[in-house]
Amino acid sequence: VYSESQDPNVSRPFRVCEHCGQPTPSHEPQCVNCQAVSLQAVVAEQEAKAERRFLRALFARATPVTYAILVVNLALYLLMSVVAGGNILTNIIKGSDSLTLVAFGAKINELVLAGEWFRLVTPIFIHIGLLHIASNSYALWIIGPLIERLYGSARYLLLYLLAGIGGGILSLIWQVAADKPSGPSAGASGAIFGLFGVIMVFSYKYRKELPPNFRSAIKSSFLPVIVINLFIGTTIPFIDNAAHVGGLISGALLTLLIPYLAPDSKRVSKLGLITIAMCALVIIYSFARAYLVSEPYLEEHKRRAGRVENISN
């Protein structure tokens, strides 16, 4: 006599066919008696096809903005290493001095409060040392293409920029409120944490339309990374964890407002091109402003370097 086990944890080698009522092997989509296809097998096959279509359409999208950001970050880092003077290789390894960082637009709270608001944008693209830019570049390389494919290049750039600004604002508020000394602050980590915030809220907001395996992979891949990085930020004193938290919150809130670009949606639109152009103009304008006020810092840097050289001679 055939009897199904009532314990869900017990492996069931047989199932009851919905059509003929006879036992048939569970791993076979068709009943061995009446050849009818299991409804569960049909549903599973439909879900598998939908997931394959979703992933094919998603990964067919290019990710030019992520690569452009990586190139800009690296180019600015190398340019700072040259402008800082001295041994370029040493500057690349150790990073530029404080005055060079400020000249290129690093965040200094007093200067931001004095009206140099462009210093909430420029720090997103400059870095303090080799390990700093290497770790941020790696993180962006991992998560950036996924977010850009999900949201499209225009929305992705907007999310990245606004999350970075949000991180800078919370860092400013936190340091001023805590009366902490203000040194040069820079790096893409606030914007990258914003992307972590995006993926967290995205996986919940669209949980009903995302393929289950894809949604599970997102949670298992990125949630531990977020927790570990926030923990590291609280244990190492020179890390601006307020910028990380600010970026994370900004990215999460923006995801509630900005819809993602479904795989069957049009990739490029006029609004998207306008968005990219506006973001690019904001970035260019911010660095232009930084250049216009950079001379005093670069002159002071040269003066100090000359004084050190005279002493050594």
Question: Residue spans of the language-model regions?
Answer:
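C-terminal transmembrane module of polytopic alpha-helical membrane proteins
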Residues: 1-61, 230-313
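Hydrophobic faces of alpha-helical transmembrane segments in multi-pass integral membrane proteins
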Residues: 139, 158, 162-166, 170, ...
